[in-house]
Swiss-Prot record:
GO biological process assignments: cell growth mode switching, budding to filamentous; cellular response to starvation; ergosterol biosynthetic process; filamentous growth; filamentous growth of a population of unicellular organisms in response to biotic stimulus; filamentous growth of a population of unicellular organisms in response to chemical stimulus; filamentous growth of a population of unicellular organisms in response to starvation; localization within membrane
Enzyme Commission code(s) on record: 1.14.14.17
Regulation of catalytic or functional activity: Activity is completely abolished by Triton X-100, deoxycholate or Cu(2+), and partially inhibited by thiol reagents, rotenone and antimycin A. The allylamine antimycotic agents naftifine and SF 86-327are potent inhibitors and show apparently non-competitive kinetics with respect to the substrate squalene.
Full protein name: Squalene epoxidase ERG1
Chain sites annotated for binding FAD: 15-16, 35-36, 43, 148, 164, 332, 345
Catalyzed reactions per annotation: squalene + reduced [NADPH--hemoprotein reductase] + O2 = (S)-2,3-epoxysqualene + oxidized [NADPH--hemoprotein reductase] + H2O + H(+)
Localization per Swiss-Prot or TrEMBL: Microsome membrane; Endoplasmic reticulum membrane
Feature type site, description Important for enzyme activity: 77
Cofactor: FAD
Transmembrane portions of the chain: 4-24, 431-451, 466-486
Organism: Candida albicans (strain SC5314 / ATCC MYA-2876) (Yeast)
Bilayer disposition of the protein: Multi-pass membrane protein
Function: Squalene epoxidase; part of the third module of ergosterol biosynthesis pathway that includes the late steps of the pathway. Erg1 catalyzes the epoxidation of squalene into 2,3-epoxysqualene. The third module or late pathway involves the ergosterol synthesis itself through consecutive reactions that mainly occur in the endoplasmic reticulum (ER) membrane. Firstly, the squalene synthase ERG9 catalyzes the condensation of 2 farnesyl pyrophosphate moieties to form squalene, which is the precursor of all steroids.
Length: 496
């Protein structure tokens, strides 16, 4: 057993673990971070970061994690709906500075670590003089290794490679978590801390510590593949392909490599037998690929190097209860959404920012003060909902809208794209929500139902006078469908 008692133990060194560990360490806390495998991971998600995620990295003083990994700028979205296309830029900085300004974590920023450097692929002047906010795309593993190195460079951080097998509770008070038990080559080692934070990701072993029913649902899968030297219709944009097929995403992760993620609608993964994945991509996705990108897609298709990952949803539970003192969930172990909108890292990083601010020593002098931490966690749960509810509800609603093929959904899809084509606030609002720079749930509510009513209006126009009775019936179908695919998720995110 380790004789050292830490202020905080962080379980997991994915994207979120190193950020909260670094923030605590810079605030003077003694932190232990435990990771099962410190080698570079190879994942097909966590490669596209929205502008609100970039903002969070600045607030944490960890923006340089996107440097020197051949990251590429992301300046907005290119949407292809059947044979129609529209390009949507990210919000203007002058607007973003009002709706979601940069507010550094106290003691985490030194005036240098919140500044991006120029490197072989990123130009600081391009970022600084662009009138709009930017996101970035990169290889997940390279980005993660930079985050980990920044974390390990902190004098107050101790990094250990081990598997956490058990959450330790106080024998005299089982409601209080006092540390973790780990399995190492030398045997079992226990570590103790005043506060334990689990950031062990989508397959979290410890989220059930809060409740045995705290489990995610799987509604679909992503099939991922890499394209080499692909030509895309809009450089520097995330590409979303919509139409008579499940949605697909295309975005560059380096100057020469492009990621494609294709939704497979099923609660079970696609079969690896009989070339089922190959045939699915060839028959359903290939016809929708932009013509410039087809050669590279065909080449990747023939290589048959497919990666499959579940798309999971889990709303965040309230934390700080009397029977879980000294224990916090953070990141994907707490909360997940459909990755269609690329908002996972954005939500997690902003949670790190918020928690580091709320637990700063000027508010919580000692992590042993469980009663005070419980109060701060209630504030955390309430304040995180603005961004969390927007990103999570938007992701699952867009997936539900574009992944199924019922008549009301087809009417809504058509109305949604036509709504974007109107321009102005019909596109500025939605991209502000998607980017995380407009974290306002009621704005999402307004735009979603504006789309619904506009869809009904367009359908009346298309049906004409003779088709009025049918259009009237379809109007009720469309509005009912809109309520069903949107309201329960928004309610769950806001109220739970």
């Amino acid at each position: 057993m380790s004789s050292v008692k830490y202020d905080a133990i962080i379980i997991g060194a994915g994207v979120i673990g190193p950020t909260i560990a670094t923030a605590f360490a810079r605030q003077g806390r003694k932190v232990l971070i435990v990771e099962r495998d410190w080698s570079k991971p190879d994942r097909i998600v966590g490669e596209l970061m929205q502008p609100a995620g970039i903002k969070a990295l600045r607030e944490l003083g960890m923006i340089k994690a996107i440097n020197n990994i051949r990251a590429v700028d992301c300046t907005g979205y290119y949407i292809k709906y059947y044979d129609e296309t529209i390009t949507i830029p990210y919000p203007l900085k002058k607007d973003a500075c009002i709706t979601n300004p940069v507010k550094p974590v106290p003691d985490a920023v030194d005036g240098v670590n919140d500044k991006l450097d120029s490197d072989s692929t990123l130009n600081v002047d391009d970022w600084d003089f662009d009138e709009r906010v930017r996101g970035a795309a990169f290889h997940h593993g390279d980005f993660l290794m930079n985050l980990r190195q920044i974390c390990r460079d902190e004098p107050n951080v101790t990094a250990v490679e081990a598997t956490v097998t058990k959450i330790l509770r106080d024998p005299s008070d089982p409601n209080t978590v006092i540390g973790v038990q780990t399995k190492q080559p030398s045997g079992t080692v226990d570590y103790h801390a005043k506060l334990t934070i689990s950031c062990d990701g989508i397959y979290s072993k410890f989220r059930k510590e809060l409740s045995p029913t705290n489990v995610p649902t799987i509604g679909s899968y992503f099939i991922g593949l890499y394209l080499k030297n692909a030509e895309l219709p809009a450089k520097g944009k995330g590409h979303v392909l919509l139409g008579g097929h499940a949605p697909a995403l295309i975005y560059s992760v380096s100057p020469t490599e492009t990621r494609v993620l294709c939704v497979y609608v099923s609660s079970k993964p696609p079969s690896a037998a009989n070339d089922a994945v190959y045939k699915y991509l060839r028959d359903n996705i290939l016809p929708a690929i932009p013509k410039e990108t087809v050669p590279a897609f065909k080449e990747a298709l023939e290589e048959r190097k497919f990666r499959i990952m579940p798309n999971q949803y889990l709303s965040a539970m309230k934390q700080g209860s009397e029977n879980h003192k000294g224990f916090i969930l953070l990141g994907d172990s707490l909360n997940m959404r459909h990755p269609l909108t690329g908002g996972g890292m954005t939500v997690g990083l902003n949670d790190s920012v918020l928690l580091a601010k709320l637990l700063h020593p000027k508010f919580v002098e000692d992590f042993d003060d469980h009663q005070l931490i419980a109060k701060r966690l209630k504030t955390f749960h309430r304040k995180r909902k603005n961004l969390d509810a927007v990103i999570n509800t938007l992701s699952i609603s867009l997936y539900s809208l574009f992944a199924a093929d019922k008549k009301p959904l087809r009417i809504l899809r058509n109305g949604c794209f036509k709504y974007f084509q109107r321009g102005g606030e019909c596109v500025n609002g939605p991209i502000g929500l998607l980017s995380g720079m407009l974290p306002f749930p009621m704005l999402l509510f307004n735009h979603f139902f504006s789309v619904a009513f506009y869809s009904v209006y367009l359908n009346f126009i298309e049906r004409g006078l003779l088709g009025f009775p049918l259009a009237l019936f379809e109007a009720f179908e469309v509005l009912f469908t809109a309520i069903v695919i949107f309201t329960p998720y928004l309610w769950n995110e806001i109220v739970r």
